[in-house]
Amino acid sequence: MGHFGEIAGHFGGRADAGMAYFQYICNMEEPILNSHNKDEYPPAHTAEHILNRTMDNMFHCGRSRVNHIERKKSKCNYDLPEPLTDEQVRQVEARVNEVIGQDLPVISKYVTRDEIPDGIDLSRLPQDASETLRLVYVGDYDVCPCLGSHVEHTSQIGEFRITSTSFNEGSFRIVFRLTPPAE
């Protein structure tokens, strides 16, 4: 599994391009996936994966139900009975940055529905989702089905900063920005 990141490095750091090449050179059949109409900013989209896992690990709220991921700022909404305290928000931010700092590999793996690991929530997939799914792994920290663009390693994300939060009728919103890593 570690070779996917090395292969992706030859394709501008895009793990999905590296995986496609890996399948081509192995003469594997190209997976048939649903179309994806979003053009995410890979560092912010990968940070969203880490934030989702962190929120679920700490508060058992599942992944964000509503999100909007952009280069300038991003927001994720979580189903929670009450807002997080300022201290809890600082803990979330610190944990996300800790994971980013581990320089974890971000890889994709194509699997059939029968091969999905236990614990992966498929409830948000469209009803017409293909039989083959693309799982995105952020090291051993997170895994979920995803068609978006990601960085090759978490150290390419930069610093994660929660800039504001709000709470309305059981929905806790986190707005975050990224400071690009020093080159």
Predicted feature locations:
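Accessible peptide chain termini
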Residues: M1-G2, M28
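Active-/binding-site microenvironments in catalytic and ligand-binding cores
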Residues: G9-G12, Y21-E183
